[in-house]
C-alpha cells in the first residue's frame, strides 16, 4: 500500500470529527446558546472552521489520488503529502481556538494557525501541480 493511500485512510477516519463539529454548531443554533448566537465574530469563525475542515479534507483526498503520479522525488512527495494534510487540521484549529472565549470580539493569537495552513496548502498545491505537469 502506498503512503498516499495510507494517508487517505487516516483522513477518512477524521470525517466523524467533522460531522461532530457540524452537529455542535447545529446544537448551538437550535439551543440559541449564549456566547454563540450573540457573538457574530464567533459564529463566523466557527462556521469558517467547520467549512474549511470539510472542504480541505476533500481537497486533500483528491490531491492524494494524483500525488503518486507526479514527477517528484520521494522526499518532495513526502513534503507535499504532509503539507496537503496539514491545512485541514491547522486552519480549522485556528478558526476555532482563536475565539474560545464566548466574549471574544476578535481572534486571539492562535489565528496564526489559519495562515500557516494556507501557506502549507499553497506550497503543496503548486508543487503537486508542477510535478503533474512535468509527468505529463
What do the PLM-derived regions correspond to, one by one?
Residues 1-136:
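Polytopic transmembrane helical bundles with strong interfacial aromatic enrichment
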Amino acid at each position: 500500500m502506498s503512503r498516499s493511500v495510507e494517508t487517505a485512510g487516516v483522513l477518512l477516519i477524521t470525517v466523524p470529527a467533522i460531522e461532530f463539529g457540524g452537529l455542535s454548531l447545529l446544537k448551538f443554533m437550535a439551543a440559541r446558546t449564549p456566547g454563540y448566537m450573540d457573538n457574530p465574530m464567533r459564529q463566523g469563525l466557527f462556521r469558517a472552521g467547520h467549512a474549511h475542515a470539510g472542504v480541505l479534507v476533500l481537497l486533500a483526498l483528491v490531491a492524494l489520488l494524483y500525488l503518486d503520479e507526479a514527477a517528484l522525488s520521494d522526499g518532495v512527495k513526502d513534503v507535499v503529502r504532509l503539507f496537503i494534510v496539514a491545512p485541514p487540521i491547522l486552519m480549522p484549529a485556528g478558526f476555532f481556538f482563536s475565539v474560545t472565549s464566548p466574549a471574544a470580539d476578535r481572534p486571539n493569537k492562535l489565528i496564526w494557525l489559519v495562515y500557516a495552513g494556507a501557506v502549507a496548502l499553497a506550497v503543496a498545491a503548486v508543487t503537486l501541480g508542477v510535478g503533474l505537469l512535468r509527468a505529463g
